[in-house]
């Protein structure tokens, strides 16, 4: 049967397409918007059956043009947390998602979709519960509102609906994201260009570089998506993070030490990296004050209860792999 991946040329979507290929799945319809044409590179090493622009997909899907569709991996969205055009964000992330959901429910198609930890905003608790959800920007609100729709629909749904609140995802195939690419990606490029990595200094009670996030490798994100794809009886909204909060210092230090290792140099401690000017702290920008999550950490209780028991990569493991991959692309 046919599989559909929206946002297929994007970061997570392309990784899902590649992972499906590795299972022998090639009857895949890739849906995206290639106005930014450089994203095509993410699909060059992938096998797909067809490509559709997102503007024509919804109508054709609702019309039944693709026959029996087993599953839709809905990864297509505007993920720019600094986007201020609320009308565009709601149309792209909320209305479009509702249209895809409605057809999946009507046709009995598995619906696996990208939600976001941005829903939690400045909360210090990260559980899939309404009372801790308070997005700080319109991107987070667009994801929040769609999750509320899912909560209302789930009790009567006859087919799978699985939403994943992605935390800070990093890994291969994110180059096109530009300023919205991961910290690991930017640290890598900055170190190669300038010989040092810059991190935010003290802010909101956190020491320089000690703001913490739940950084999760796209390898693990893909594995979780495929686990639920294999278990269509499992539905719900799930946090998708490692369950470990790690500081930005860990990302930067791992990037520096991996690049040093590739240059046959010995690893350094964080203190040594700072002392030698390999990591530099800069004042926290005014534009981000009040809009910045200083701490995120996924509560994995629901995910583990659903049966997903595989370990998640640490920053040291995942970023080391990623930096080596990036180095091979240069």
Curated annotation (Swiss-Prot):
InterPro entries for the chain: Epimerase_deHydtase (IPR001509), Heptose_epim (IPR011912), NAD(P)-bd_dom_sf (IPR036291)
Its top-level enzyme class, in one word, is isomerase
Q: For this protein, what is the EC number?
A: 5.1.3.20
The note describing how and how many cofactors are bound reads: Binds 1 NADP(+) per subunit.
What does UniProt list as catalytic?
139, 177
| Cofactor(s) listed | NADP(+)
Q: Which family does it belong to?
A: Belongs to the NAD(P)-dependent epimerase/dehydratase family. HldD subfamily.
HAMAP family reported in the protein's UniProt record:
Heptose_epimerase (MF_01601)
**Function in brief:** Catalyzes the interconversion between ADP-D-glycero-beta-D-manno-heptose and ADP-L-glycero-beta-D-manno-heptose via an epimerization at carbon 6 of the heptose.
What assembly does the database describe for this protein?
Answer: Homopentamer.
Q: What is this protein called?
A: ADP-L-glycero-D-manno-heptose-6-epimerase
Q: Where does this protein come from, organism-wise?
A: Burkholderia cenocepacia (strain HI2424)
């Amino acid at each position: 049967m046919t599989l559909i991946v929206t946002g297929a040329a994007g970061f997570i979507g392309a990784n899902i397409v590649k992972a499906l290929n590795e299972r022998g799945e090639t009857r895949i319809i890739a849906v995206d918007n290639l106005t930014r044409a450089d994203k095509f590179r993410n699909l060059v090493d992938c096998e797909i059956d067809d490509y559709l622009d997102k503007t024509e997909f919804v109508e054709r899907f609702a019309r039944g043009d693709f026959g029996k569709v087993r599953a839709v991996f809905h990864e297509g969205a505007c993920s720019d947390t600094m986007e201020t055009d609320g009308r565009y964000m709601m149309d792209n992330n909320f209305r479009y998602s509702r249209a895809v959901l409605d057809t999946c429910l009507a046709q009995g198609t598995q619906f696996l979709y990208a939600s976001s930890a941005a829903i939690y905003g400045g909360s210090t608790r990260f559980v899939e519960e309404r009372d801790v959800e308070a997005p700080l920007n319109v991107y987070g609100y667009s994801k929040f509102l769609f999750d509320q729709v899912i909560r209302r629909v789930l009790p009567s749904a006859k087919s799978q609906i699985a939403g994943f609140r992605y935390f800070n995802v990093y890994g291969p195939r994110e180059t096109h994201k530009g300023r919205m690419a991961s910290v690991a990606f930017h640290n890598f490029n900055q170190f190669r260009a300038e010989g040092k990595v810059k991190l935010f200094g003290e802010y909101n009670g956190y020491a320089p570089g000690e703001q913490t996030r739940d950084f999760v490798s796209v390898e693990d994100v893909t594995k979780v998506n495929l686990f639920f794809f294999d278990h269509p009886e499992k539905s719900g909204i799930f946090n998708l993070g490692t369950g470990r909060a790690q500081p930005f210092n860990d990302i930067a230090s791992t990037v520096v030490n991996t690049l040093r290792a590739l240059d046959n140099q010995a690893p350094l401690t964080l203190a040594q990296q700072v002392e030698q000017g390999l990591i530099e702290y800069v004042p926290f920008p005014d534009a981000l004050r009040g809009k910045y999550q200083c701490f995120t950490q996924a509560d994995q209780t629901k995910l583990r209860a659903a049966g997903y028991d595989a370990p998640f990569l640490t920053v040291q493991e995942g970023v080391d792999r990623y930096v080596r991959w990036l180095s091979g692309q240069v």
